[in-house]
Structure formats: structure tokens, C-alpha cells
């Protein structure tokens, strides 16, 4: 059985483990009402009961002191969840030194997911209170609001340092009372809604695009994590472009349709994926690992997490304070979870080692990037839609290599119908791998593309067909606006196989 058949068989036998809308609460900040439209759009799309919307006045700052967190967020949120029947327990009048009212659980919480929306504060500042475990090398009671709220169904715990996440590496965990959280947030409500709609489109039509992995970070352990993503991406049909130097992908690198962007390590968005024209594919899974990637969500120019939301990420991650490498999200486990049929939120928690710590998860936790089989994507591929080309490319990537005569014929036919450079280049590369020599077609019928793809095509054409042919290709494509496609006959759908 080929890789494609194995992949399809795996997906058809996996039950979609989606979060339960009735057991999901959504928190908005009435002091920043722009988040309400995001909450309503999300709740409507996912069928979350209107009664599960919790609106509290939470101020206008990203950072809260512990007393404010306790009295403005944690206490009132527990009260509302108790009233809604989503939490079982009793609040006490007495408070601890951080201002938290005592809480005694009296049963298992119905609540399973808590989604925080744009405008809800981001993090809790260090209190200065000496911890109970001075031997703990991971010190401090500072944390992301999201990660701290994951413990709201438990008695108040000492927040010094990180706690193990019971969902880490376990698909069947009960959670030990930990409530999984996610956040719909970014620099602007418009960016958040656009990223959400992109994820919903990808869930309905399939996650389509290419993969890019940036190695060369400061520690071998992290590089090993990202390197472990290469084989699974190939097995999924997304053979990645890999940057192995200490630098980011250069601005001249290829960057079309990034469905997966996984890498590190720069403080600010830079390189190819720090450029505004490098838009992510709808629903993209994007992670740039940096200690302070979500220090603020207000300024995408200086923080990777809001930048990736701005660029369209369906799922991304960030750290609000220094997390230490071993306690950050594990990209190879994220891929493992997604491959096994987990939703974006489930896979994110499967890949997160710690709770009551620094991480945040940005995106719709219900999002299923592989809800549509590749077979269905190939059947739906149309010459009218550029992303359909990437479904076809993924299909051909999963066939035995080099491609045989019939597969090459079908790839050539698809490339001719499309008229777009990504598919045409892939066809020429496949022919070269199979030992087939054919002239490069006149570029007049090709659409214009992003600069990195043009550069890759020019290098290939120069090596295979000569300098003059390559120069003609570059001159023709670079004089057109990106995405401009000449009229051509034959825009019927591509055959399935």
C-alpha cells in the first residue's frame, strides 16, 4: 500500500475528537467591546450556547498584578461558571496573600475549554512573594493569564514555577481538573477575524500549501525538535523547504502558500516570514519559537505571535515571559497530534509541557486542518483557484517517486490547465527526476508569482534549459503584478487520479 493510501486509511479510521461546544465557555472584556464581535462569530460558527458567553469588566491593560487577577478575573469568572453549572465547588470569603478567594471543588467541572477573546488581559506580573520551594530552578509566579486560568477548577495552588501539563503527550488524559484554554487575539480585531475565517475555510476545503522549517537556533535540543518535523511533513505530502543557517529564511527565499511555518530564533519578525507580502495560507499552522514572542499582542512589528496572526495563521503560539526551552511547545508533538486527528487546540495542549506558566495558544481550538481528505481536495481542485494547485502537488508528492509515465502525464495536464508557476515548476522538476527531457514552455501563459518562487524557477530553468530561456522567464514574470493571470482556455476541474 502506498503512502497516500495509508494516509487516507489512517484518517478515515480516526474519529474526529472535537471539543464539546456545550462544555466551552468564552470570556470577553466589556471594557474593550471590539472582542464581542469575534466572540459572537466564533460561538455562532461552533454552536456554542449563548449562555456560555461570560462578559466581565477587565480593564484596558495587557498585564495585571496578582491582586487584580484574583479579584477582577479569577473570582468573578468562577462565580459565573458556578452559576452556569459549568463548575462545581464553593468559594470562600478568606483570601490568600495574592488576593485569591479560597475555592473547594465539590465535583468534576462540566467545563472543558475556556476561550479568551481579544481584549482580555494577557499576563500576570510577578508578585514578589517568596515561593514555597526555593530549590525550584524554574522560579517566579508570573504567567500568562491563559495558563493560570487553566487551574481555575482546582483549589488555589502555589503558583511558584511551572506545573506539569497532564495533557502533555497524552491523547487520552483526563486532565486532572486542568481546563484547556485558547485565545482568539492579535493586534486588531480585523486580523483576528481574518485569521479565524481562514481557518474555517481550510477546515471546509482542506489545508493547502507548502511547508517551511527554519533550523539553526541557539540550542541543539530545539533544533532536534524542529528537525524531527521534517519526516512527518514529507509523509503528509508537504516536503519542506529547510533553512539550516543561524539566520532566518532570507527575503529572497521561496515563500508561496505557507501551510506550515515552523522555526526559530529571532526576537522580532525578520527574514522572509517577517515580510508583509509573505502571507500565510488560510488555516496555516505557524510557530516561531522565541522566549518573548507574545510579550505583547499589540505590536506585530516586534512580537512574532501577533505578527503570525496578522499574516493569517490559523494556529500559532507565544510566550509572555521567559519560559525556558524545555517548557515550551514541542513542534514535533504538535504535528503528531494533528496527524492523529486531534483538533488544533487538542494538538496544542498535547504538545505543551507545562501549565501555570508562560505559553499561550492563539487560534480556534475546534479547528480541524485535516477534516477534508486529500482525495476530496484533489477532486475539487480547479484551475480557477491557485490553492487547488497545492492539493494536486501534495497528491503527486505522495505517489512513488520518481513519477511514472501516467502520473507525469496527469501532472503535465494539470500544469497546463493551471498556468501557474508552482505547478509548472513541479512538473518540470518531476520530469527531470524521471529522466524526461522536454522544452520549457513559453512563459507568456504563466501567471505572475511571489519573488522567491520566480527565483527558484529561474535557477532551475537556467541549469536545465540555459541562460537565455531563464532570462526570458524572469523578464516576463517580473514585469507583471503578482497574481496576474493571462486568459486561457480550459478551466475545467482536474481529474481525481
Regions found by a protein language model. Give the residues of each.
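Short coil/turn linking the two alpha-helices of tandem helical-hairpin repeats
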Residues: 401-403, 433-437, 465-466, 482
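Cysteine-dependent hydrolase recognition
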Residues: 18-410, 416-420, 433
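Terminal, low-structured helical/coil segments at or just beyond the last alpha-helical repeat
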Residues: 468-497
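Bacterial N-terminal signal peptides
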Residues: 3-13
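Alpha-helical repeat scaffolds
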Residues: 406-415, 437-448, 469-479
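Generic helix N-cap/helix-start motif at coil->alpha-helix transitions
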Residues: 385-392, 417-425, 449-456, 469, ...
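Conserved small-residue packing positions in alpha-helical repeats and bundles
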Residues: 393-397, 426-432, 458-463
